[in-house]
UniProtKB/Swiss-Prot annotation:
Any one GO BP annotation for this protein: glyceraldehyde-3-phosphate biosynthetic process
Name this protein carries in UniProt: Triosephosphate isomerase, glycosomal
A Pfam family: TIM
Pathway assigned in UniProt: Carbohydrate biosynthesis; gluconeogenesis; Carbohydrate degradation; glycolysis; D-glyceraldehyde 3-phosphate from glycerone phosphate: step 1/1
Protein keywords: Gluconeogenesis, Glycolysis, Glycosome, Isomerase, Peroxisome
Amino acid sequence: MASKPQPIAAANWKCNGSESLLVPLIETLNAATFDHDVQCVVAPTFLHIPMTKARLTNPKFQIAAQNAITRSGAFTGEVSLQILKDYGISWVVLGHSERRLYYGETNEIVAEKVAQACAAGFHVIVCVGETNEEREAGRTAAVVLTQLAAVAQKLSKEAWSRVVIAYEPVWAIGTGKVATPQQAQEVHELLRRWVRSKLGTDIAAQLRILYGGSVTAKNARTLYQMRDINGFLVGGASLKPEFVEIIEATK
């Protein structure tokens, strides 16, 4: 097997957290040491970003935002890329299935956000994935490749060095269901093969593709053994000390 690119373990805390929950968790992350080359990213709520940034001193970890809009101005309730830059944030998660489902973010909206974020110097975790209905209808490939193609249409080849793809089967998020390693690998391989055919071997080889569907310490190691899985985007389990074990599984 060819060597994998540097793995990433990303924590998406979603709309969760309080100081009483997060401070002990951050202390656990600060105390963690890893004997392999892994990149760790934590995405708190917007309100918890300053506290997390101040308290999370382990140099292995970087802070991400869970969303952003491309412009500042009269957009009540939103946070722009420029505001995130002012706070020293260099990572952002875009296109999460919950943003697509609950806030009507289309492939085109997500693609424009990704392009603007890359142009502004951010590293971007771009989420793609299919619903249970789409999987049952045999449309997994069509759905995820359409999502990916919309992003690719907006990006230069140079911008891909800032992009990480996260495959999150919507049917496995927060449900306790998890894709088998073989199911996950099938989609990861499909995504990498598409990138190779459209953008070239070099971009495909260095692209990190994360798995993001009900990842736990119990299944992470087996999932990471798959050739095209380069790490994880973790939801619920990232709010527990278990996240350290998931990070350790990426070796």
